[in-house]
């Protein structure tokens, strides 16, 4: 299992600050990371789904996932969505980053 709260995945400073000290937010982020690694990319459009599929098939490019932040976890977060992006599929080790759209 991927453990975001112990820095096994890069997180933006904003995501880290939002999740730090809140086990329930960290647990939700780990759930999102597990979905991302299982090819459940959340709420992305068909174009991004096709691009993700091509990236996996060709071992080239990046994978993006988008997960809406549940209202009970938002806690003042202005972004309603978390993005997870895995880059450099053609050059292992890959880099996975968790960020809010406003961090991009």
Language-model segments: what does each one mean?
Residues 1-71:
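Compact soluble domain cores
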């Amino acid at each position: 299992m991927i453990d975001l709260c112990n820095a096994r995945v890069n997180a933006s400073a904003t995501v880290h600050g939002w999740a730090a000290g809140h086990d329930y937010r960290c647990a939700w982020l780990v759930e999102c990371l597990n979905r991302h690694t299982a090819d459940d990319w959340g709420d992305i459009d068909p174009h991004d789904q096709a691009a993700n599929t091509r990236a996996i098939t060709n071992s080239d490019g990046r994978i993006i996932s988008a997960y809406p932040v549940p209202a009970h976890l938002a806690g003042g977060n202005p972004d309603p969505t978390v993005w997870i992006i895995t880059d450099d599929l053609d050059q292992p080790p890959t880099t996975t980053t968790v960020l809010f759209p406003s961090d991009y």
